[in-house]
Amino acid sequence: MKVKVLLFASLREVVGSSQSAVELEPGASVEDVWTRMISLYPRLAPHTGTIAFALNSAFTNPHEALHDGDEVAFLPPVSGG
């Protein structure tokens, strides 16, 4: 199945784009997308444990199952004053 990936802020800078797509086996989870992205872009690894996950525009947990055509977003922590 194919999943669209959205990346924001520092994650976008690491990948060099705000969007990507990955092919995964049926039954894959949001966490599997993150693992695949790390295999493609190893500099994402330090962000593990600090990012928020969204599935089809709603925050979710990393174990949520995916379906073909889903949109997964990875969001780093927001800071500022």
Which role does the model predict for each range below?
Residues M1-G80:
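Ubiquitin-like/PB1-type beta-grasp interaction modules and other compact soluble beta-rich domains
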